[in-house]
Amino acid sequence: MSLYLNKNNDKFISYRNDDIYIDKSLLVGVTNKNIGIERKKFMCITRPRRFGKTMALSMLNAYYSKGCDSKPIFDKLQIANDESYLEHLNKHNVIWIDMASLYTGLNDKSIFVQKLKEFIYLDLKNNFKNINLECDLTDGTFLANSIIKINSEINERFIFLIDEWDVIYREQENNKRLCDEYTELLRNLFKSSDVSACIDLVYMTGILPIRRYSTQSTLNMFTEYNMINPRGLESYIGFTEDEVKGLCIKYQRDFNKIKKWYNGYKLKDVLLYNPKSVVEAVLSGEYGD
């Protein structure tokens, strides 16, 4: 079973079956339009904690991954009415990485980049057994070369979904060696035109602005979608006011109290609420921090 490559849809099913689920599947229609387009396919979504970043990634994995059949799930969601719906449904090789999970699982943080490269390589090796992939953890380009080789021999392309991509910069900001090592990995994977030609989409989420870590044009291929400039993603970040009103009607809760406590952002003309706080308030009937 792969750790990162072509995972199943279990996590999204868990979100879908929760007591409260808000359909944000039209986000897929946005990402579908960016697939394979050089100036659009590198997406970095920056937003605060508890604003549904992980749920969105689980949905994108469930939709794109060749490792599952998600048609019965998405047939019932809004994206099913989008003209691009069937074009990409479960037709991509998806590498889905939770950087924070890997980081917290390591006692020795200094080997973070080494283990990340090792785990991705093993997934590639085990899933593409007919291709001779060389492993050299000391070579910063060997992962990119593996992806290029797979593409050149069998024309397979990849989507990267990365959760909390900036965890190393946040947690190890004083460890220059580790941060530089991680930056080099990202540059080798995404900056090179040769490997970029093998990638259909990169959708990564973080907390702090990408420009803070983008030195010497390292990550300048990414378009940042944040709380100041959501670039059309405002309806998919948090719960909208109409969605919260709908929940209050369904669960007979006081919308004005929820608005008082949890109405935190206005993006363009869209009022946004923290999903986790709203769900807890709606289910419990209690309001506060």
How would you name each of these model-derived features?
Residues M1-D289:
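Phosphate-binding site recognition
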